[in-house]
């Protein structure tokens, strides 16, 4: 039995191509893996702590030797919430990420969430020589990204998500691109339908 974290970086909309493909993937995944535990994290519905001045100052104080209990109440609340997001990622065996491509990059909320999983001392560490090494292993990720244009995985969003996941130790990253719908509007429905079929095929193997 695996624990699957599903990170949704797209507001709900019946027109969302991202969500259509994600739903097809998850429907099939649940059929194939009925005993797995699915935990959904909708970044547009939940409050998760972004890095801000209080987080930076809390990290500085802890690094200087202060205890968590010595931090201000605001620092404690924010850091605890930030750490909860990190721990949620660490507890997952598989991670599914779904997002649209916005200005060649992932949505800002997804970037903020990724900051919570890219944490020195928890998901990676620096060696004595200054080299960064991952602290996670054995995880798998599946990335769904929808885009109106055609980028063939050369966009910054694709490379960023894969790069960070690899950096923290997630070496198995499968990408499903749903793209070209705006560039070829007459083919848009078929592109999405084909992606749904492909998502189900890949769900069987994930």
Report each predicted region and the residues it spans.
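Glycine-rich phosphate/pyrophosphate-binding loop and the adjoining helix
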Residues: 152-206
């Amino acid at each position: 039995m695996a624990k699957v974290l599903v990170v949704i970086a797209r507001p709900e909309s019946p027109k969302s191509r991202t969500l259509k493909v994600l739903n097809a993937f998850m429907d099939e995944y649940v059929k194939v893996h009925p005993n797995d535990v699915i935990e959904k994290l909708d970044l547009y519905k939940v409050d998760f702590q972004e890095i801000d001045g209080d987080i930076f100052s809390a990290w500085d104080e802890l690094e200087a030797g202060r205890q968590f209990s010595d931090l201000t109440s605001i620092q404690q609340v924010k850091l605890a919430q930030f750490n909860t997001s990190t721990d949620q990622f660490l507890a997952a065996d598989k991670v599914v990420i779904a997002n649209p491509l916005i200005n060649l990059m992932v949505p800002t909320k997804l970037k903020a969430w990724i900051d919570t999983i890219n944490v020195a001392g928890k998901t990676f560490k620096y060696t004595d020589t200054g080299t960064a090494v991952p602290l996670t292993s054995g995880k798998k990720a599946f990335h769904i990204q929808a885009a109106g244009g055609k980028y063939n995985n050369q966009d910054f969003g694709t490379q960023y998500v894969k790069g960070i996941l690899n950096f923290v130790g997630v070496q198995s990253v499968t990408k499903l691109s749903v793209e070209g719908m705006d560039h070829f509007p007459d083919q848009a429905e078929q592109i999405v339908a084909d992606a749904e079929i492909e998502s189900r095929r890949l769900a069987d193997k994930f």
